[in-house]
């Protein structure tokens, strides 16, 4: 689908500068765009790297910016973040009306076992040897790879992609809206989440785990990663290959986790950061910033695991040490 740039300019009450581009096909993240994309630069991180995006049309604030050959600017008077609800709604896809439990346009492979009370939406593609248990919902345009097993009460929303030989345990929700809101006139205003979730081959997703769809771009779970029960993965996260994510981990949005990473139970990971390959984070730790590869860390704040163990041992001695300090002060 293509969108006229002039319609977007009118929608945003904006001006245009630079190379004339008539149409774009999608809204994409700044560093993950192509020549058919529209993207936006909301802050200094992006504004100083305008030449680094492949998008030919960029939404920018009304400030003095150098023109770049081959690129056009849609200049908005409001902050680019303020116009986000309007912009993402413009690019959101309208879903078809639900008509029956298995829509006629759905394509079902060979040797597929579908239990009663399963909804299969318009244009869904289900591969061979898939097993789907009762009370599952598979939304419009989703793709389920060969050999995947989907247990009861799983919700897979529209346009989600599930790879081959995956296992999705009961109650998991894949493709729910990310927690995306901005303040408009002092009110929390929802931003349409127009991305999706891509789950690669051989992934397991635990019971009652939730994986949010991307706001712009996709949330990605790479092959052979195993996710335990009751895990929250937010919008636009990228989880690498062969990761282990244990129960009650929460990962905030737009975080990238490398390959072979282990996050132990109840780890909290902040948003917009990177965790390097082969890293292990101990249980109940907090991750507030980037983590280098090949580290074993724990605690809050996060430190080397051996140092964290020494701190915990020392903390047990604090009551006795305080008594000794008080006694020494009284002798003065």
UniProtKB/Swiss-Prot annotation:
Q: Name one Pfam family in it.
A: Hexapep
Going by the record, the broad EC class of this enzyme is: transferase
Tell me where on the tree of life, at the top rank, the source sits: Bacteria
User: Where, by residue number, is the active site?
Assistant: 235 (proton acceptor)
- Does the record carry Lipid biosynthesis as a key word? yes
Entry's Gene Ontology cellular component terms: membrane
Q: Which GO terms describe its molecular function?
A: N-acyltransferase activity
Query: Reaction(s) catalyzed by this protein?
Result: a UDP-3-O-[(3R)-3-hydroxyacyl]-alpha-D-glucosamine + a (3R)-hydroxyacyl-[ACP] = a UDP-2-N,3-O-bis[(3R)-3-hydroxyacyl]-alpha-D-glucosamine + holo-[ACP] + H(+)
Pathway in which the depicted protein is active: Bacterial outer membrane biogenesis; LPS lipid A biosynthesis
Q: Which cysteines are joined by disulfide bonds?
A: none
Write the record's keywords in alphabetical order, separated by commas. Answer: Acyltransferase, Lipid A biosynthesis, Lipid biosynthesis, Lipid metabolism, Repeat, Transferase
Q: How does it assemble?
A: Homotrimer.
Q: What does this protein do?
A: Catalyzes the N-acylation of UDP-3-O-acylglucosamine using 3-hydroxyacyl-ACP as the acyl donor. Is involved in the biosynthesis of lipid A, a phosphorylated glycolipid that anchors the lipopolysaccharide to the outer membrane of the cell.
Q: Which family does it belong to?
A: Belongs to the transferase hexapeptide repeat family. LpxD subfamily.
NCBIfam families per the UniProt record, alphabetical: lipid_A_lpxD, PRK00892.1
Q: What is this protein called?
A: UDP-3-O-acylglucosamine N-acyltransferase
